[in-house]
Amino acid sequence: LTISVDLVLLGIFKYGSFILSNIKFFTGFPAKVPSIMLPIGISFYTFQLITYCVDVYRGDARPQRSFKTLLLYVSLFHQCIAGPIVRYKDICAELEERRASQFDIAEGINRFTVGLAKKAIIANTCAALADTMLVPDGGDFSLLASKSVLSLWVGVLAFTLQIYIDFSAYSDMAIGMGKMIGINYTENFDYPY
């Protein structure tokens, strides 16, 4: 029931206006379609709640008695943007008994800094190169036909590296931030392709 409610709410927020405007268009119903504001991170929060419910239902984790601790799991801000995806059963004990030593904090800062450097220096440079090679001046994509095959391949490879390094960097930053507050995430970005 909880998972159904979560998915219905996600559907309403993500697709409610779209569905209502299509119904209005096809039926000619003269009602005004409300603009539904999409809460930031609704998909992330929904899937966090679903993993919690599934882990508790399967008996992989016991139900959380502290609303504050459950809220912490659902809203782990540092992994909200790009992961890593973490199951409740994998970190429930750490949520209740978090301890961050000076070594953990230093290691977390180091990992976060490496991720930030990967993003700011390598991924952003690859993005600029990909844009130069693949996005024509003025946005007229018919001009791509005039580019050499080599420049297009360089653009495609730069774009591929940008995406790979972006996600790797975001994972590094999230793992580092988790370490700083006493949460050890599993490595999940060894071989994404």
Cite the ranges covered by each PLM segment.
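Membrane-embedded transmembrane alpha-helical bundles that form the catalytic cores
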Residues: 1-193
